[in-house]
Amino acid sequence: MFYTAATALRDFLKQESAGGIVLMFAAVLALIFANTALADTYFSVLATEIAVTVGGGGIEKPALLWINDGLMAVFFFLVGLEVKREVLTGQLSSWKQASLPLIAAFGGIVLPALVFYGINSGTPENLSGWAIPAATDIAFALGILALLGKRVPVALKALLLAIAVIDDIAAIAIIAIFYTPGVELAMLGAAAITLLILSAFGRAKAGSSIPYIVLGIVLWYFVLKSGVHATLAGVALAMTVPLIDRKGNHMLEHMEHALHSWVAFLVVPIFALANAGVSFEGVELSALFAPLPLGIALGLIVGKQVGIFGFAWLAVKTGFAQLPSSVGWLQVWGLSLVAGIGFTMSLFIGNLAFADPAQINAVKIGVLSGSLIAALVGIAILVLGAKAPAAKSADERVQAPA
């Protein structure tokens, strides 16, 4: 089936918005499990060892790590497909289209990290979590915009989407560079050879998805064993998928479209269910003001807000970018707060940054409180800044910010 860039964007917004609502439900369910009589069962299930053996080798991991290392590789594969499409044919394919989201996203990555560092500079053991508040959960953020309906112009959703894609690129780079403790060269070499074979299929524009599935699993195994985080195999695999196969079918967009529902309604909610369960037993309000959770929360609330809005304002005022005609500054301010919903990616990076259960619990408190406050304040500002946009054609409605 033929999918235009506009159709792909509309499908993406629809799926991720609906998925955001499911994600909210999964997060609430995790909190209920972790703070009721079901807590022991909940944490016991996540700690259950699961072994998969093939031939003479195999992998044995707790259920939680199968979700974080295995299932989330599918999520990162979809992220990789979206990034490749946006760079080749979408909102990041030219400077005119990409300038505003690029500059805004840069501010939204740097400022939260600086806020976190400033608050945790006196506690060196926390500094490895500097990237936690730099992330944006696109499913949650678009879910919030979806709840506001027509009060939010499509151009604002497109701007948020572009910022989130750039944010994902940065998160992938951060994970690869800063959260890879050691590398097993033999396994990394095997992964590289597998990736070269996949690239050959991509260059030949092979139209079957079977080689990508089979070799993708092999690539994931080698990357896992190499010491590099296994989810990055998903991103690498996505880079080998051709935009158009030899028969002229839009293979990348077709694959992206086929995966959306699975990721939005299964993969990410399962991740949330497994990772958002923080026990509040014995936790006092003062725990929120400890450096680690406070740095994360303020990074998401203040850092994202000042970074995205401030850099976007400077870019427009200095002539480096242009604000879409249907979007006002009050709406950009609301967007900058909604982008402070870190959730999925923030929790994911938190699990990479820390091994101590107490620190991971503090990360969850910071991410949940910061994301909740950012969402509520962002919604209030977007409601205040709501205006009825003029009717536009389908192409104009999905056109990226210029």
Swiss-Prot record:
Q: Does the keyword section mention Membrane?
A: yes
Q: Known InterPro entries for this protein?
A: Na/H_antiporter_dom_sf, NhaA
Keyword match Cell membrane: yes
What Gene3D superfamilies does its record include? Na+/H+ antiporter like domain
Cellular component, GO, one term: plasma membrane
Q: How does it sit in the membrane?
A: Multi-pass membrane protein
- Its catalytic activity? Na(+)(in) + 2 H(+)(out) = Na(+)(out) + 2 H(+)(in)
Give one GO term, molecular function aspect: sodium:proton antiporter activity
Q: Where in the cell is it found?
A: Cell inner membrane
The UniProt keyword set, sorted, is: Antiport, Cell inner membrane, Cell membrane, Ion transport, Membrane, Sodium, Sodium transport, Transmembrane, Transmembrane helix, Transport
Chief place where the protein resides: membrane
UniProt record, GO biological process: regulation of pH
**So where does this one cross the membrane?**
18-38, 63-83, 99-119, 129-149, 158-178, 182-202, 210-230, 258-278, 296-316, 329-349, 365-385
The record's family statement is: Belongs to the NhaA Na(+)/H(+) (TC 2.A.33) antiporter family.
Report the protein's function: Na(+)/H(+) antiporter that extrudes sodium in exchange for external protons.
Record's HAMAP family? Answer: NhaA
Name of this protein: Na(+)/H(+) antiporter NhaA 2
Q: Which organism is the protein's source?
A: Erythrobacter litoralis (strain HTCC2594)
